[in-house]
């Protein structure tokens, strides 16, 4: 475990001067090319469900020189520079931006593909983004300014690797708790419980159909993490919903995404 994780122990509340809070803000720094970051996104989806009244999550593409250089090296234009593309997607809302980056990651991580304009165009469409607005936003001056803001935030929080999560309570005088790397789900729930400092009533996930309708686009890995079902049972339930014409499997990328049919 990292030094940050070791700060939280069963009897550490008094030492850390932690008092009960009602809301935690989590900054999630990710590398779009990282398999660990892709796995963490499913864990964060589960946290959002169970602790939705206690946490808010802000995703930030890690603006390190290494990540931005890789984004630039793999691009032929601003459209397929994933750092700029993600910022443009964000201007159309957090949910659509997250769908967009999940689609891109599912293309480039399992198959180790190079990002192309056609790939990005497909992901824009499947994420429900407005293509013309997206292109306009790519040329907006506020886009690179927004990247500079992310860079400032990352430096202030001393982010050195991705994935990294930084947990903040409501006390502006308290430093954030940084957790670098990928850990089992129960580690993150333990941190949330320690920071809240009072009894937490976790929410149960909605029905599988309702969750897919809410999110519009999901990965099977995300569903397996959230529902903790055997994969055989999950496949059966997904097939049942597909036969009922309530969801459909995306032909690309790799059929690992399921989309609600409206």
From Swiss-Prot:
Keyword Transit peptide found: no
InterPro entries in the cross-refs: Adapter_SpxH, Thioredoxin-like_sf
Pfam families in UniProt: Thioredoxin_5 (PF13743)
TM spans (from-to): none
Main location (coarse class): cytoplasm
Keyword Cytoplasm belongs to the record: yes
Annotated Gene Ontology cellular component terms: cytoplasm
Keywords: Cytoplasm
Cellular compartments annotated: Cytoplasm
Functional description taken from the UniProt entry: Adapter protein required for efficient degradation of Spx by ClpXP under non-stress conditions. Interaction with Spx stabilizes Spx and exposes the C-terminus of Spx for recognition and proteolysis by ClpXP.
HAMAP family noted in UniProt: Adapter_SpxH (MF_02245)
Family the entry assigns: Belongs to the SpxH family.
Record text on subunit structure and interactions: Interacts with Spx.
Name listed for the protein in its UniProt record: ClpXP adapter protein SpxH
UniProt gene name: spxH
């Amino acid at each position: 475990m990292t030094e940050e994780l070791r700060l939280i122990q069963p009897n550490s509340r008094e030492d850390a001067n932690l008092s009960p809070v009602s809301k935690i803000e989590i900054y999630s720094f990710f590398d779009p090319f990282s398999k660990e970051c892709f796995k963490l996104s499913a864990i964060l989806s589960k946290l959002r469900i169970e602790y939705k009244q206690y946490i808010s999550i802000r995703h930030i593409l890690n603006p390190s020189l290494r990540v931005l250089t890789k984004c630039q090296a793999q691009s032929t234009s601003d459209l397929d520079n994933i750092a700029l593309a993600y910022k443009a997607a964000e201007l159309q809302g957090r949910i659509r931006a997250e769908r967009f980056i999940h689609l891109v990651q599912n293309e480039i991580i399992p198959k180790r593909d190079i990002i192309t304009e056609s790939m990005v165009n497909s992901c824009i469409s499947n994420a429900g983004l407005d293509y013309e607005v997206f292109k306009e936003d790519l040329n907006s001056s506020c886009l690179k300014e927004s990247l500079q803001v992310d860079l400032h935030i990352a430096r202030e929080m001393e982010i050195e690797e991705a994935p990294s999560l930084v947990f903040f309570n409501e006390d502006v005088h308290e430093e954030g708790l940084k957790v670098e790397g990928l850990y089992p789900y129960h580690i993150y729930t333990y941190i949330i419980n320690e920071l809240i400092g009072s009894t937490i009533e976790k929410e149960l996930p909605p029905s599988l159909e309702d969750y897919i309708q809410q999110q519009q686009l999901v990965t099977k890995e995300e569903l397996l993490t959230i529902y903790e079902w055997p994969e055989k049972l999950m496949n059966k339930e997904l097939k049942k919903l597909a036969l009922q014409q309530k969801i459909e499997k995306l032909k690309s990328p790799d059929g690992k995404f399921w989309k609600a049919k409206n």
